[in-house]
Amino acid sequence: MALQSESTGPVSPSVDPAEIAKFSRLSAEWWDPTGKMAPLHRINPLRISFIRDAACRKFERNAKSLSCLSGLRMLDIGCGAGLLCEPFTRLGAQVIGIDPSATNIAAAKLHADKSHLAIDYRCTTVEEIDPRERFDIVMAMEVIEHVNDVPAFLGRCAALMKPTGIMLVATLNRNWKSFALAIVGAEYVMRWLPRGTHQWDKFVTPDELEQHLQGLGLVVTEQSGLVFNPLADRWRLSPDMDVNYMVVAETAP
């Protein structure tokens, strides 16, 4: 049975209550592209295109179609205030967004209502989702570096995939470069993120992530790094996975 916190919602084994509280404090900032969540707004177009294109390749859809994800069930784990849920709803997906922070879910619902979008937002954790529910696309974007038990968390994510589904994971590599750029640079020098947003020892290397996924009977089919160009002031997809990276996984043949 999940523990209940008035301010942060349900807590389960893989959830770190301190991480929930941290992002709850940012709930009012989620949709401000120049505020504390500006880094996510900057990187969001790349995340959206990567996920959309991976899904369209898997399900043989035309990525240029404005309804290319029509009929697909999508689960966004750790959805925050819906920065991914809204664009994928507009592309036709049936989106369920979950987050253990009640304040984040409230912010997400408010923004979706203002945008006239029907999104199923739930203040819950992946462990609390009915195991009979299945999804074509399961997303855990910038989440696993904030959970307590990565293997258990990924196991629950995998259990919610349809046999023909895909899982997308975005996280941060663990090395000296990610410490220098994602923590010292982003939190202390550039001040893109509040200090303490990330804990370097919770970062996950691509090899570790792939081993976890293989242990669940999944195979990585696509992967990409995300690299920031300070001269152009923009992010781009790159083979360089030293800091930020994303992977796509599906059931092994």
Curated annotation (Swiss-Prot):
GO terms for biological process: methylation. This is Ubiquinone biosynthesis O-methyltransferase. HAMAP family: UbiG. Pathway: Cofactor biosynthesis; ubiquinone biosynthesis. Belongs to the methyltransferase superfamily. UbiG/COQ3 family. Its EC number is 2.1.1.222, 2.1.1.64. One of its GO terms (molecular function) is 3-demethylubiquinol 3-O-methyltransferase activity. It catalyses: a 3-demethylubiquinol + S-adenosyl-L-methionine = a ubiquinol + S-adenosyl-L-homocysteine + H(+); a 3-(all-trans-polyprenyl)benzene-1,2-diol + S-adenosyl-L-methionine = a 2-methoxy-6-(all-trans-polyprenyl)phenol + S-adenosyl-L-homocysteine + H(+). The gene is ubiG. Keywords: Methyltransferase, S-adenosyl-L-methionine, Transferase, Ubiquinone biosynthesis. It is an enzyme of class 2 (transferase). S-adenosyl-L-methionine binds at R47, G78, D99, M141. O-methyltransferase that catalyzes the 2 O-methylation steps in the ubiquinone biosynthetic pathway.
